[in-house]
A protein has these predicted regions:
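Substrate-binding pocket helix/loop in short-chain dehydrogenase/reductase
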Residues: 77-78, 85-90
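N-terminal Rossmann NAD(P)H-binding glycine-rich loop of SDR-like oxidoreductase domains
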Residues: 11, 19
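Active-site helix of classical SDR
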Residues: 101, 136
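Residue(s) in the substrate-gating loop at a strand-loop-helix junction
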Residues: 120
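Conserved NAD(P)H cofactor-binding loop of Rossmann-fold oxidoreductase domains
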Residues: 69-75
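C-terminal helical subdomain
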Residues: 156, 160-161, 173-205
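Rossmann-fold cofactor-recognition segment
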Residues: 36-48
Length: 205
C-alpha cells in the first residue's frame, strides 16, 4: 500500500512547501486547513476534522507520517488580548497538535510512523509582544517532549522543529533576514530519511 502523510496547515507557507516536497518524493499527502484548496477543509483543532482527515488518508494507503504545521500568530503586548484571540492562538498552535497526535500516536507506536511537530523559536525563548503565541508554542514543545519520552522502545519516532521567521503569509510584512520556507522544508524532509536518529531541529535565521 502507498505511504500516506497528513500535513496540517498544508496549503500555505511551510506546510505547503513540506507537502509539495513529500509528493515529489513519492508520498501520498493529505493536507488539512481552513482553505478550500485543502484535501480536508476544516478547523484542525476540532475532533471531526481529525476524524475526516484520518479517514481520507486511510482510503489512500497506510498513514506513516504526521506533520503538524497548522498555526496562527496574533501579537501584542501582554494585557492587550481579548478572549477570542487567545483561544484562536491556543487552538491552532496547541490543541490541533494534541488532537492529531493523540489520534495517530498509539498506532505509530504499534505499527511504525513519524510525527513532526513544527514549533518555533518562540517555543525556546521569551519574545516581546508574543506572550500568547509563546505560551501556545511552549505548550506544544512540552507535549512533544513527552511524546518523545513515551515513544522510546516503540516503533514511533517524534521530531520537533523550531524554525525562526520565514517569508510566509503568517507574517503581515516580511522582515529582513527571514528564511525561505522551501529551504526549511528540505531540511525537515531530509531529516526523515537520515541514517541517524534526528529528534530535534532548530533553524535560526
Amino acid at each position: 500500500m502507498a505511504s500516506v502523510a497528513i500535513v496540517t496547515g498544508g496549503t500555505s507557507g511551510l506546510g505547503e512547501a513540506i507537502a509539495e516536497l513529500l509528493r515529489e518524493r513519492g508520498m501520498q499527502v493529505v493536507t488539512v486547513s481552513r482553505r478550500d484548496s485543502a484535501d480536508v477543509t476544516g478547523n484542525a483543532a476540532h475532533e471531526d476534522t481529525v476524524a475526516r482527515a484520518v479517514a481520507h488518508a486511510e482510503s489512500l494507503g497506510d498513514i506513516t507520517l504526521l506533520v503538524n504545521c497548522a498555526g496562527v500568530g496574533l501579537f501584542g503586548a501582554a494585557g492587550s488580548y481579548v478572549e477570542e484571540d487567545v483561544r484562536q492562538v491556543i487552538d491552532a498552535n496547541l490543541i490541533a497538535t494534541i488532537l492529531f497526535c493523540d489520534e495517530l500516536f498509539p498506532r505509530f507506536t504499534r505499527d511504525g510512523g513519524t510525527i513532526v511537530n513544527i514549533l518555533s523559536t518562540a517555543a525556546l525563548q521569551a519574545k516581546v509582544n508574543e506572550s500568547v503565541y509563546c505560551a501556545a508554542k511552549w505548550g506544544a514543545r512540552g507535549y512533544t517532549e513527552v511524546l518523545k519520552t513515551e515513544a522510546k522502545g516503540t516503533k514511533a519516532r517524534v521530531i520537533s522543529v523550531a524554525p525562526g521567521g520565514m517569508h510566509t503569509p503568517f507574517w503581515e510584512q516580511a522582515r529582513e533576514g527571514f528564511m525561505d520556507p522551501k529551504a526549511i522544508a528540505r531540511v525537515i524532509v531530509d531529516a526523515l530519511d537520515a541514517a541517524v536518529n534526528v529528534s530535534s531541529i532548530v533553524i535560526e535565521r
